């Protein structure tokens, strides 16, 4: 069991890892921490009816419009879990109408997600306190995108510290095979979906943000999907440049309402569903450098220095 040393200005506190007491507590913690699955809209939990085998307990839709099969286990898991989640993925591919019905029943769902119900893409997420590294070899051999995510917990009085570790196939030099249906979100892709001139401006602003990140020496990676470009540190998104339509796009920041008054720039609007502020970008008029205080705030909020 791992120890965590929490060093403050006055003292160093040694914390023991605090395993989750039950599957229910583990699930409650995962779904109660919105940052962990912020790119996924949950359709329903525990949808299994009767004793039907092969139907997953937790299903969601991500910002790419992919069906997400989420498997939570409050125990160490190894490669033996792969056949089970593959069965779930096959069910999702062959029963899109069942998932579509659940999606349409949602009262609150993002309007900008495009889902191909005729030929859906499926993504698998396996979440557990500990995942055997041997699972990586099996994951890279199957034709579905798979995320292996470890979550451990430490407790100090009323505070919880969560360690989130997304296992990567590069860790031990495993040969990476292309995943079936995995899209490449480049300039050509966006031009096939959006206004071509707007796409050029979209990438111009992304380049300007990347220059700021480089000058500040921030540890952020640029990640594209169908709806936005995210600047991420590991598992967490610091900020985004997001499409609002075929022509318009915006800077997006997850900032508490009470803190937005600290900044001189007025947001265009607040997204109540996603709890984030949207600042529309006017090509040629919006200056990226004016948003540096917002970039800094959001980077520090995910633990950046």
Each model region followed by its residue ranges:
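Charged, terminal alpha-helix-loop-beta segments
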Residues: 1-305
């Amino acid at each position: 069991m791992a120890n965590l040393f929490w060093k403050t200005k006055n003292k160093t506190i040694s914390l023991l890892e605090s395993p989750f007491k039950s599957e229910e507590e583990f699930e409650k913690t995962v779904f109660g921490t919105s940052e962990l699955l912020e790119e996924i809209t949950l359709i329903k939990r525990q949808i299994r009816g009767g004793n039907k085998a092969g139907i997953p307990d937790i299903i969601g839709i991500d910002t790419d419009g992919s069906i997400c099969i989420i498997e939570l286990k409050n125990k160490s898991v190894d490669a033996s879990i792969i056949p089970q989640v593959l069965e779930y993925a096959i069910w999702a591919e062959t029963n899109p109408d069942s998932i579509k019905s659940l999606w349409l029943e949602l009262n609150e769902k993002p309007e900008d997600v495009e889902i191909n119900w005729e030929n859906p893409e499926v993504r698998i997420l396996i979440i557990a306190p500990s995942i055997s590294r041997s699972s990586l070899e099996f994951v890279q051999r199957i034709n579905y995108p798979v995320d292996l995510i470890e979550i451990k917990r430490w407790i100090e009085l009323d505070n919880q510290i969560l360690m989130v570790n997304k296992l990567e196939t590069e860790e031990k030099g495993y040969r990476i095979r292309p995943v079936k249906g995995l899209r490449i979100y480049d300039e050509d892709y966006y031009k096939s979906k959006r206004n071509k001139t707007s796409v050029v401006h979209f990438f111009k602003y992304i380049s300007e943000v990347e220059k700021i990140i480089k000058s500040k020496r921030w540890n952020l990676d640029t990640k594209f999907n169908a709806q936005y470009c995210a600047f991420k540190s590991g598992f967490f998104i610091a900020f985004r440049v997001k499409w609002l339509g075929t022509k318009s796009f915006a800077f997006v920041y997850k900032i508490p309402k009470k803190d937005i008054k600290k900044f001189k720039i007025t947001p265009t609007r607040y997204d109540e569903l996603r709890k984030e502020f949207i600042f529309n970008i006017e090509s040629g008029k919006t200056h990226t450098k004016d948003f540096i205080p917002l970039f800094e705030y959001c980077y520090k909020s995910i633990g950046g220095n």
